[in-house]
Design a protein with these regions (language model features):
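Compact beta-sheet-dominated domain cores in extracellular/mature segments
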Residues: 3-104
């Protein structure tokens, strides 16, 4: 039993990532970030994809440091698919939660 516990403890949890794009159709410059519930800077983010098979919620902000003007994208709207951001303002930061709970 002790061996099985050590074996499962050694298997890392699968990391879920978000890929951001500078073009609405998921083109242009890309950056990859972890879906870790932390605020990430991403100037000119116009679309994103989150790894398939993972619950999440992406909250996009028009201000720096995840402040002001939010758009929310919960699962399953964008699971593994290109999600365009139709925003009138530039998107400067975002938060990708580790589950489907959106930031407020």
């Amino acid at each position: 039993m002790k061996f099985l516990y050590m074996l499962f403890a050694a298997i890392p949890a699968l990391a879920v990532n978000i890929t951001t794009f500078t073009v609405i159709g998921c083109g242009g410059t890309t950056h990859i970030f972890p879906c870790d519930g932390l605020c990430h800077a991403s100037s000119n983010m116009r679309a994103f994809k989150v790894d398939a098979g993972a619950e999440h919620c992406v909250t996009v902000y028009s201000g720096n440091a995840c402040q002001s003007g939010t758009l929310q994208f919960p699962t399953p709207n964008s699971e593994g698919e290109c999600e365009p951001i139709e925003a009138s303002q530039a998107t400067l930061s975002f938060l990708c939660s580790v589950d489907n709970t959106c930031a407020t």
